[in-house]
Curated annotation (Swiss-Prot):
Organism phylogeny: Bacteria, Bacillati, Bacillota, Bacilli, Bacillales
GO terms of molecular function: ATP binding; glutaminyl-tRNA synthase (glutamine-hydrolyzing) activity
Protein name (database record): Glutamyl-tRNA(Gln) amidotransferase subunit A
Pfam families with a match to the protein in the record: Amidase (PF01425)
This protein's record includes keyword Nucleotide-binding: yes
Family: Belongs to the amidase family. GatA subfamily.
A GO biological process held by the record: translation
Active-site feature positions: 80 (charge relay system), 155 (charge relay system), 179 (acyl-ester intermediate)
Domain of life where this protein originates: Bacteria
Ranges annotated as spanning the membrane: none
UniProt source species: Geobacillus sp. (strain WCH70)
Length: 486
């Protein structure tokens, strides 16, 4: 049995009783990485020397100062490689940032460091978080621990795979259109996209600034709540972070959902959703009914426009955000330039991968003078309609529930030839980002040995309710206890 089969609160108790040390936890992480990393390939950079030194420092602190410390104290964590870490290489899985060492920490890293968490390393992802399979990484292919011939999802594929494989007890990811929830579903773990503004984006390398959110990927709902508790809250360094009180999320995990009203959008169980996935969700709803909740079918009529809206808006924002990677200040610079303009052009042509180039071109086109109103402005108007759909449903219901993804994990290489089939994989998660509301994916079944995710969506800043529902479901089932046979 691995130490990481325990919940974080249980590991915390073992530390308090001196039955294990912080060094034991870090050793366990690197031991497991040594066993499975060659197969899974979740990490881009390991932080072994610093992690072991910090573990020793925290063990000394424990010996001198006793047990008065938070639940994350001494816990190993993996960090998605688009969150800047002072002195630890941050690449966004892109050749253009292959040698970038940040000189400051993201706000979430400062908060984790203050809580005593220990960074084990930086995790693989789709380049600049653009993708749904982690196949767009500029460096390596991460594999799904449940089936090494399949993708782990994306763009936070490294984060989900590392947690599922037991390399770390938890990890941070980022979610722009499903990039935490979709890989969490594919890898059979718990992934939360918080409300937009709940967690500071300062130090998150921007893809689409109006959509990006950092969030936790964990083995259990309780662990997820502990991690969000530490990273959530107002940050003066991020003008979009919200001045909304952060409740005690763990206290919300009462197991009581009697009288809870669930909305199930017919659009989320219709065309394109695999029958076995649909059945897993209907079975999950029966479990929630037994626990005292009720559900009704509703409509989110503008969801069918979400995919097109998202790709116009996200690509437009990416076009602007990625203009800073020009070879002048940091990162990759071409050796073949004849002049300054040529240097910009060659650096970006050689440094960016195909998917990033595709989205930059799409966004630049959508923002161009003759097409701005027809594409970008119209997409913003449709985004408002999508948001209003959610607001209308939430007037009557507490949460919205459906599948996280239309299918379980697909085979490596299966969708790389056709960007549109790849994009369609996020069709159920994208509306949540456009509306800015929180959503969580929890394991709810298996299809041919592959995990299926249940998506629970809540009102703005009401992560507590979706945690309560997710936890009640988790405690009534044992899907979260299943582990891949690595």
């Amino acid at each position: 049995m691995s130490l990481f089969d325990h919940k974080i609160s249980e590991l915390h108790t073992l530390l308090q009783k001196k039955e294990i040390s912080v060094s034991d936890l870090v050793d366990e992480s690197f031991r497991r990485i040594g066993e499975v990393e060659e197969q899974v390939q979740a990490f881009l950079t390991l932080n072994e020397e610093n992690a072991r030194a910090k573990a020793k420092e925290l063990d000394d602190k424990l010996a001198k100062e006793g047990n008065d410390f938070g639940v994350l104290f001494g816990m190993p964590i993996g960090i998605k490689d688009n969150i800047v870490t002072k002195g630890l290489r941050t690449t966004c899985a892109s050749k253009i940032l292959y040698n970038f060492d940040p000189i400051y920490d993201a706000t979430v890293m400062e908060r984790l460091n203050e809580a005593g968490a220990i960074t084990i390393g930086k995790l693989n992802m789709d380049e600049f978080a653009m993708g749904s399979s982690t196949e767009n990484s500029g460096f390596q292919l991460t594999r799904n621990p449940w089936d090494l011939e399949r993708v782990p999802g994306g763009s936070s594929g490294g984060s989900a795979a590392a947690v599922a494989a037991g390399e770390v007890p938890f990890a941070l990811g980022s979610d722009t259109g499903g990039s935490i929830r979709q890989p969490a579903a594919f890898c059979g773990v718990v992934g939360l996209k918080p409300t937009y503004g709940r967690v500071s984006r300062f130090g998150l390398v921007a893809f689409a600034s109006s959509l990006d959110q950092i969030g936790p990927i964990t083995r259990t709902v309780e662990d997820n709540a502990y991690l969000l508790q530490v990273i959530a809250g107002l940050d003066p360094m991020d003008s979009t972070s919200a001045n909304v009180e952060v409740p005690n999320y763990v206290e919300a995990l009462t197991g009581d959902i009697k009288g809870l009203k669930i909305a199930v959008p017919k659009e989320y169980l219709g065309e394109g959703v695999a029958e076995e996935v649909r059945q897993s969700v209907l079975d999950a709803l029966k479990v929630l009914e037994k626990l005292g909740a009720t559900w009704e079918e509703v409509s989110l009529p503008h969801s069918k426009y979400a995919l097109a809206t998202y790709y116009l808006l996200a690509s437009s924002e990416a076009s602007a955000n990625l203009a800073r990677f020009d070879g002048v200040r940091y990162g990759y610079r071409t050796d073949n330039a004849k002049n300054l303009i040529d240097m910009y052009k060659q650096t970006r042509s050689e440094g960016f991968g195909n998917e990033v180039k595709r989205r930059i071109m799409l966004g630049t086109f959508a923002l161009s003078a003759g097409y701005y109103d027809a594409y970008y402005k119209k997409a913003q108007q449709v985004r408002t309609l999508i948001k209003q759909d959610f607001e209308k449903v939430f007037e009557k219901y507490d949460v919205i529930i459906g599948p996280t993804t239309p299918t379980p994990a697909f085979k490596i290489g299966e969708k790389t030839h056709d960007p549109l089939t790849m994009y369609a994989n996020d069709i159920l998660t994208i509306p949540v980002n456009l509306a800015g509301v929180p959503g969580i994916s929890v394991p709810c079944g298996f299809v041919n040995g592959l995990p299926v995710g249940l998506q629970i969506i809540g009102k703005h800043f009401d992560e507590s309710t979706i945690y309560r529902v997710a936890h009640a479901f988790e405690q009534a089932t044992d899907y979260h206890k299943q582990k891949p046979a690595l």
